[in-house]
Amino acid sequence: LDDADEIYNIHVDNCTFDGVQDQAVKRTGKSHDIFFNNLVVNGSTVLLDPPYKHYSEWMTHSEMKRAPQSYLLDFAKKPRWSYTIGTELEPMLDTYRAYKDESILNYCKAYPDKMIAADGTITGYKYEDFNLDNCRTGHFLINLYQLYPQPSILKGMKTIFKQLENQPRTKEGVFWHKAIYANQVWLDGIFMGLPFYTKAAPEFKGYKKAKKYWDDAVDQITKTDKRTYDPATGLWKHAWDETHKQFWANPETGQSQHSWARAMGWYTMAMVEVLDALPSNYARRAEVVNLFQKAMAALVKCQDKKTGLWYDVLDVKDPKNYLEATASSMFAYCLLKGYRLGYLDANYKDAGVKAYNGIIKNFIKVNPDKTISLTHCCEVSGLGPGYNPPYVPENKVNKRRDGSFEYYMSEPIRDNDGKGVGPFIWASLEMEQQGLPVASK
């Protein structure tokens, strides 16, 4: 076509092209007025006029279309109290703050309206489970409460904060992940519990007493770093068993076998959020900043050079390993926000932009209904539970979840998992608000 001249009014209708590779396009000016209708390239619909200017809005409204009721996000079949739903709704709320679309705010309000009774009772929440996952949505509630100060929300938050005050701990003082995971510290749990714990302390205990809670949060982060860090790889293991007796734990270190990318994503996002909540003059902020910098430096080293993305298991090179969307979205967000807040230098911003654009090119799919999807999301990965009376009897043991590479590869991959959608929206907001260049689809 380089020699073609005056080709115009081209209509490409009902065509599908697979295996198309990125390459430089030479603009000659000899052809123009090209129109697309129902054109699909590499499984993604090509749109001349996207319905939203910003990916944060586009993904938010895509999810709202897929789940018209917010309590049915993340493939829920009935209303449920879920950290995943909270992890989606919070960046949606931030999208409302950025672009003032009232339909988004109303969507966010609908979740506590449905899930929290007037007396503060939370549907599906069991205090006695001491499940850190069930505390995460408190962080969404405390942010929503600033815009929607309902008494029921306040009562629900107080219940969650009470759980954290009484959460069982390791001998060193770090929260157990759940009662069924007694004596275990998971990187996931740092995100589920500590940001809300840190942010809510001055609200419920007063500013003077809050320092004790802030010190506690920083202590837990530093102790988690110590127990999960692997100097041999320069990465952090998914979890640590204080007893060294769980079937998945190394009997010498208590650590699980591998560095799972999403666990690292939870951990790094937690540190950013704890820093958001700590006062600027709080003496121990630097400890958290230093640990955050240490983690991000390690993650940039294992960023895929070609795509800017990360593999599901960070410490294994194997053809079965795959580039994974939830963790890549988390790391992009942390790199970009860390740069904006001055924790990271410009090299990390560049790594964040590369990661984000890698997500757009490799994981974002435009659907025929003009929604977008985040593909290649690991649905779930965990460890055990192992035999742990009285919490886990023999018939409840799950030996399949042994922390091996083969185990991680066995878990399902799906589109639009909320654990990736939420961080993708956050990363999009960072790109948009910093005016950084976004790749075209």
Predicted regions and their residues:
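Alpha-solenoid repeat junctions
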Residues: 89, 96, 145, 201, ...
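Short, contiguous, pocket-lining structural segments
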Residues: 185-192, 209, 213-216, 252-267, ...
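Extended ligand-binding groove/face enriched in aromatic
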Residues: 106-109, 115-250, 254, 366, ...
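Extracellular parallel beta-helix/beta-solenoid repeat domains
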Residues: 1-48
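Inter-helical turn/loop segments and adjacent helix faces that build the functional surface
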Residues: 99, 200-215, 274-286, 338-346
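Alpha-helical scaffold segments in carbohydrate-active enzymes
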Residues: 62, 91-94, 114, 159, ...
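Oxyanion-binding "anion nests"
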Residues: 266-315
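CBM-like carbohydrate-recognition segments
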Residues: 26, 47-86, 98-108, 114-138, ...
